[in-house]
Amino acid sequence: MKRHGVCNTSGVALTRYSERLRFRTTHYGNGNMATSHQSCCGRRLDFYTGPGKGWCFTSLLPVLRRYCSASSSSTTAVAPVQAHGEDLYVSHYAIPEDAHRLVGTPQLLPRSPAEEVAFKKSLIKSFPQACIRNVSVVAHVDHGKTTLADAMLRFSNLLPADGATGTFTDRLQVEKERGITIKAQTCSVLLTLRETGTQYLVNLIDTPGHVDFQYEVSRSLRASEGAALLVDVRQGVEAQTMAQFYAALEQNLTILPVLTKMDSVMNDAEVEKTLLQLEDSTGLLSREAVLTSAKSKQGIEQLFQHIIDKVPPPRGRAGFSDMKQLPIMHADSAERKQMEKELVPLRALLFDCWTAESSGMTDGAASAPASAATSFSSVSSGTVTASGGQPVAREGIYGLIRVMDGTVTPGTMVTFCHSGKKHEVREVGIIHPTLHPTAALTAGMVGFVFFPGLTKRDVFIGDTLCTLPTRKHTVRVGVSNIPAAELGTEPTATAELASSDSFAVEPIPGFKTVHPVVFAGFYPDEGVYITQLRDAVDLLCVNDPSVTMEQLQCPTLGPGLQLGFLGFLHMQVFKERLLMEFGQTVLVTPPQVQYMYVEQHCDPGDPAQRKPVSVSNWRWPHEGVGAYLEPFVTATVLTPTQYFSEINSAALSSFRGEMQEMRVIDDARTLVRYRMPLADLARGFFSTVKSSSHGYATLEYDDLTYMAADLVKMDIVINKARISALSTICLRHEANTHARRIICSLKENLLRSSVDLPLQALVGSKIITRETVKAYRKDVTAKIHAGDISRKQKKWNDQKKGKERMARRSVGTVTLDQSVLAAAMGATTAR
């Protein structure tokens, strides 16, 4: 009977053991410990050395071997193990029950310099790149990515087998409430092939499926060599399935076709139809597809085997990257000089960041199952090789990196290529399945680093982290053990140190710059300072780098922020995260799409000559504008055939849609594509599709282009004061309709006062709609019961003159409750 054990820097052991075992732990000094286990079949001792002190069990090993060889009744198994990423030794012994009487207290001796060097190198060689696999799980919305990822973690004994499914990798509260994946989450799994005994490190990245979070998917694919393309066996290939397939194909990844929810299949014909559809759409061979079910655990083992067999290992140069990672040696020693020559400049891709406040990493650490032993034919589960738990909240930023070349350890001084600034790494580790610190991250690994002094201004997602070499060092294609033909045209690393201390590092190709397509103003709730909202948005933007932010100043609502998003769901999720994670209740203005304009005598078809225009920087044609441009998208709707007629009628008549393609997928489903203004899609087409199809239809949009449009800016004036929060950009022929809705909403919700409140909608200087909120009037003639009518007229005239004086004093002064503004803003999105 064997057990795996680990020891971290504080001397805490994280063990997975049989239920029959009883254990006792004894500490020896700082960070050193020995653990003895006893069972009904005998006693076994596992000994550990702590990190940082250079200890070994040199004196203990001869005692054990001498006793075990002298005992004829003992079964001896001596197997030193170096746990990956931990500065420790783990030794396993199966010895008789009375062995503890002869062992006594182990004598801990310092390692020799040669042993220290060998031990440091073992950190690098414990997981060679050939035994690492990085895989992203991609699919359409609700095709079972998160549920399957959870099943894979439970199969690997990282999560309890009897726990709730489909919840662990969805760490954010908004993800759990909406039932969708918003943030890509990473988890490292250790697997051991039973036939060869080779241990593999598999990094799984669970990605979102909605188009609004495609930026999360693209970043995850950049850190992977393979992609598991999931398809719901009942739903088949859908719009976002193809989008994810092309994204993985663009990154030249190995794509593994996987069918999910096999437990819901009624007959084999349904499976064959989906496999044929997948092969026709993507070209992936149907015989290579893995049939899985997270509910019944079908195909999980086969999927792991496919990942190990078919996904290529990462490429890059392994080795130490910093002199601090080397053991202490004499500065003039030949061995030190030789190790300096073998230094490999660090290159790591930063593809995600978070703070302690804006991540779900502290939520629900998984409890270890009772037994780590998993019995299956070809792949046996690995064990936790790093201790850890829930991270404590602290100042700083966590970064998720993929190490391309070299090694990063705590204390490594890394340089951010984008800003050129240096920052020290305080902690490194893997996510297994929560944050577990390790001693190093080597080439090919995916893990986290913690920077205690880093701020949002210093972070650029997609940046390259590197180390400055201490000598002139150039690494080019073909100099490593990997042939140049396999590396392609991209150099592995290039780092040169000139006499002027300047350096050049070949940056890792980052991510495409994303441009927001939806903008909205965020204003703090009544009684909340703008600084609190700004700080919360800053922290959240660390975890969501696709959001843009600008300062706003509204005379009615006060200071606020204009935020840009990748879609409408993205905006709603961001608002919910502000409330759930930071307690910030905000008033959100109606979403506006990004309009453009070109100056006179400029080509509207040239993207370089387009300039953004909004209500805050609006320019009229007489101010040099040649043409306004409106964003159009291709909306793809996949709907049950019985709902197609109603959806098509609404798209053509109410949302300015133009049908481009209609295709019958099968007997029950129809796919249709429309060319549609993004503004109309924002004003309710998505809701119309969902309500008309009772939630069965799906809608995705992409292919953003700009076309000429006759746009105007419409302002709302209350008591001769412009309300900038209600200003909007719309088509000229729709201005009257939008104005009437807003003015009527204001008239219904505004409280009457002692003076009349004129409500006006203006396009330029022209009033297109006007209403008046009548004032309260006191009955000044209540005490006049008889006499000449002129007595009453005199009172009425005096009252009228008094109200005119009050109106002159109150011009431009109006106080609006946020509920009134919210109702008016809701009227702008009504159809």
Swiss-Prot record:
SUPFAM superfamilies, alphabetized: EF-G C-terminal domain-like (SSF54980), P-loop containing nucleoside triphosphate hydrolases (SSF52540), Translation proteins (SSF50447)
Keyword Hydrolase: yes
Location (main, coarse): mitochondrion
Entry EC no(s): 3.6.5.-
Cited Pfam families: EFG_C (PF00679), GTP_EFTU (PF00009), LepA_C (PF06421)
MF term (GO), any: GTPase activity
Gene3D superfamilies in UniProt: 3.30.70.240, Elongation factor 4, C-terminal domain, Elongation Factor G (Translational Gtpase), domain 3, P-loop containing nucleotide triphosphate hydrolases, Translation factors
Residue ranges of domain tr-type G in the record: 130-315
GO CC, alphabetical: mitochondrial inner membrane; mitochondrial matrix
Official protein name in the record: Translation factor GUF1 homolog, mitochondrial
Native species: Leishmania braziliensis
Organism classification: Eukaryota, Discoba, Euglenozoa, Kinetoplastea, Metakinetoplastina
